[in-house]
């Protein structure tokens, strides 16, 4: 294989070289173009690991609009719910760029859990992280004010980074989808934050100048 997916995904980081080699033997590598849907309600259950490129995972609202759940990069994975026989009624994973992905079938993965039980614990940890992120997103969307959604999002990035300068991990259009608004509204809000001397922005890098006043701006 050109890529060792076990070397980049946190799910397998605690395994020894022999165990990783055994897993690599079960994976199938694919080169896929931008805009390829890799997981949908109609696809067979499999674990999908990103070896190169970026993916987006989203669900469709009743009006057909995408609600972005997360952007996946190298080392991230999707599809674990289907491996545990949990139905997928409305979740899609699609490539944002040309990408290299590795897949493991549900049958092979279930056998893997029996042979390498420590993966189960790591799977629980990683899934808890994903659930926490979804709960945080629900908190953003639960507020009617885009000021609150965007400022709290930026302040949460600051907390996670442990510093005032943060990098938004997705395109601004994707962030708008993630926060349930439009790119124009995000742009206007960022401009207001800059005019109020609360942030400085260069591309996707944002420096938070006054976190306390940003909290006040949110309200």
Swiss-Prot record:
Keywords: DNA-binding, Transcription, Transcription regulation. GO terms for cellular component: cytosol. Pfam families: cNMP_binding, HTH_Crp_2. One of its GO terms (molecular function) is DNA binding. Residues 144-212 form the HTH crp-type domain. It comes from the Bacteria. Residues 191-210 bind DNA. SMART domains: cNMP, HTH_CRP. PANTHER family: CRP FAMILY TRANSCRIPTIONAL REGULATORY PROTEIN (PTHR24567), HTH-TYPE TRANSCRIPTIONAL REGULATOR ARCR (PTHR24567:SF74). This is Probable transcriptional regulator flp. It comes from Lacticaseibacillus casei (Lactobacillus casei).
């Amino acid at each position: 294989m050109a890529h060792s997916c076990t070397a980049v995904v946190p799910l397998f980081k605690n395994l020894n070289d022999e165990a990783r080699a055994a897993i690599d033997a079960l994976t199938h590598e694919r080169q896929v173009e931008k805009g390829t849907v890799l997981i949908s309600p109609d696809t067979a259950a499999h674990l999908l690991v990103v070896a190169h490129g970026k993916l987006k995972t989203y669900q469709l609202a009743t009006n057909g609009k995408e609600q972005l759940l997360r952007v996946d990069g190298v080392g991230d994975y999707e599809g674990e719910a289907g491996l545990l026989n949990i139905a997928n009624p409305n979740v899609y994973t699609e490539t944002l760029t040309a990408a290299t992905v590795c897949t493991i079938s549900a049958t092979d993965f279930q056998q893997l859990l029996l042979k390498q039980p420590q993966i189960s614990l790591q799977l629980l940890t990683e899934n808890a992280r994903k659930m926490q992120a979804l709960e945080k997103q629900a908190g953003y969307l639960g507020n009617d004010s885009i000021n609150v959604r965007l400022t709290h999002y930026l302040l949460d990035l600051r907390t996670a980074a442990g510093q005032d300068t943060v990098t938004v991990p997705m395109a601004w259009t994707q962030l708008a989808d993630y926060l349930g608004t439009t790119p124009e509204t995000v742009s206007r809000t960022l401009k207001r934050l800059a005019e109020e001397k609360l942030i400085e922005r260069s591309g996707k890098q944002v420096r938070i100048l006054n976190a306390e006043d940003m909290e006040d701006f949110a309200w």
